[in-house]
Amino acid sequence: MHSFRVSMGTISALFAVCWLLVSPSRADDKQMPPIKVDVLQKGASTSKVMEQALADLPLDQLPAESRQRVETVLKNRSLFRRLPTIGMGADPAVYHYFTRNPEAAVGVWRVMEISQFKLNQTAPMQWKGDAGDGSNGSIEILHRTASRQLLLCEGEYKSPVLPKPIKAQAVMHLRTDYPDKAQSNHNIVHDVDLFVTFPSQTVETVAKVIAPVSNSIADKNFRELSMFVEFMSTAMHTHPGWVEQVVQRMDGVKTDQKEEFLKVAATVFVASRKNELQQNGVQNASFEDLIAPYQGPKR
């Protein structure tokens, strides 16, 4: 049991964002619409899927030094997992913001008291995180396009009962597609290919033994992370006041990131209200039309 906890703690240091359960039900006095994402394809770890994942890595787009670091993890990989393919209706602008400002997502979790996890940006494409339970890690984005992100992660787990920290490295390949609205019910479809290596042979052995359990947890948490993006997109559409209050209370997030957050929220809200009004026959909505549902009773 202790080995299981240690191994899971090490993995959580790499991907702490995936361990948080998001289950908001009300943002203010208005009931939130149901938050839902669709699992389009289950997670998999087969050799065939792994070979496809390896072939899909954008290694030719990396500088020599970065490519070597990635290939070291791949060569010594202990575990592979393709997380579920998930479809969601979230606004792409919201998804785009959080994938480029992960510390803002952590800031929201802290305000909502979901977690006290800390994530700080240390360079333009690098972050360090601390879960506060002995787990800590770093994330570096090596390659980024509108539809792909390749990340190199390092993490460790420290405990008074262990003679030395247990460490791990991972390569994560986030793949995102934006389906044609005429052909899909989803605005976003994404998945992650995950390659993990443990320097310790003992930890690797334990990790392989508990892989069915850890795979299930990783799949579940990726779905819940997707639900968080869906939740925030829904909140921006329907509860702009609540979103503004959350942004004002966030810590560990730069002023310009907060301003961008609010701009994204305002853009999403206005577009949503205009669409709603157009469906009700109002083609040229005024500012008063847009904010009417959020004003108090006239005196």
Task: Locate each region found by the language model.
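N-terminal secretory signal peptides that target proteins for export/translocation
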Residues: 1-7
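Bacterial N-terminal signal peptides
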Residues: 9-21
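Sec/Tat signal peptide C-region and signal peptidase I cleavage site
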Residues: 23-29
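Hydrophobic ligand-binding cavity/cleft-lining segments
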Residues: 29-123
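Terminal "cap-and-tail" regions of soluble proteins that handle hydrophobic small molecules
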Residues: 30-62, 175-299
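Envelope-exposed proteins and targeting segments
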Residues: 79-84, 91-94, 147-149, 168-170, ...
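Solvent-exposed loop/turn segments at secondary-structure junctions
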Residues: 104-105, 156-160, 196-200
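Glycine-rich portal/gate segments that line the openings of hydrophobic small-molecule binding cavities
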Residues: 119-174
